[in-house]
Amino acid sequence: MNIEALKVFKESGEKITCLTAYDASFASVFDACGIDIILVGDSLGNVIQGDKNTLDVSMSDMIYHMQAVAKGTQNALRIADMPYQSYTYAEQTLTNAKRLIMAGAQMVKLEGGCEHEASFRILQGNDISVCGHLGLQPQSVVEIDGYRVQGRGKQGANKIIKNALALASWGVKVIVLECVPAELAKQVSQSVSIPIIGIGAGLDCDGQVLVSYDMLGVHVRHVPRFVKNFLTDNGDVKSAVNAFIKAVKDKSFPSKKYSY
């Protein structure tokens, strides 16, 4: 899988599938099932380290898990989260992004929009592929007082659309859009030429991502409305992953039950 293929998916209407992984074993299963993207997410702070948020995840943590996932992946596109406070200014962003690329990432993901323009631009200028993250941004949960649906009001919706347009203009290749009304996500997807991968953002995104532990029913925290347990009706992890991929590809997931 590569970035050009993701563009073709958007143009053709084929949905993109993405799951998080943090180790070689799960990564190899997901890869063998044909998942399009594996995201080494800072969600490891929640599901691996047992924290209430992702704020204590370090660059060392991300590098360790990225290296492990890279060893278990042959075909899926590998994206790594840049953790909290690892991209506060441009030069720091470039240094840390290079470390993740060296660890096996093919793309790095940054949360936020126009406030990080310098960081997005320096990565583009150094030919490092970037994934954006708009809507609910887990690294900002303290500032926004918890995990809440974003973009419900006109002002918030317009800000998300503005940021998506800006990110696309700065060379961002993909955007993860989290926890927003389905209608807003549809508008965002129609506003930009790059793929929009939703999580709690309705059916009209160009793809779907879930935290793998959530998708498999391994919960150490509150389960968001947008999470579906694919292991319940399937006998093993591989079958659950195949069911997730099929449901995304045939556009049966997420239904309204799992959307806002």
UniProtKB/Swiss-Prot annotation:
Cofactor(s) the protein requires to work:
Mg(2+)
- Please cite one Gene Ontology biological process associated with this protein: pantothenate biosynthetic process
Q: Which residues bind Mg(2+)?
A: D42, D81, E111
Family annotation (SUPFAM superfamilies): Phosphoenolpyruvate/pyruvate domain
Q: Which reaction does it catalyse?
A: 3-methyl-2-oxobutanoate + (6R)-5,10-methylene-5,6,7,8-tetrahydrofolate + H2O = 2-dehydropantoate + (6S)-5,6,7,8-tetrahydrofolate
Q: Which UniProt keywords apply?
A: Cytoplasm, Magnesium, Metal-binding, Pantothenate biosynthesis, Transferase
The record's free-text note on cofactor binding? Binds 1 Mg(2+) ion per subunit.
Q: What EC designation does it have?
A: 2.1.2.11
The active site consists of E178
Subunit structure comment from the entry? Homodecamer; pentamer of dimers.
Q: Which HAMAP family match?
A: PanB (MF_00156)
What family does the Swiss-Prot or TrEMBL record give for this protein? Belongs to the PanB family.
Q: What does this protein do?
A: Catalyzes the reversible reaction in which hydroxymethyl group from 5,10-methylenetetrahydrofolate is transferred onto alpha-ketoisovalerate to form ketopantoate.
Which protein, by its recorded name, is this?
3-methyl-2-oxobutanoate hydroxymethyltransferase
State the gene name recorded for this protein: panB
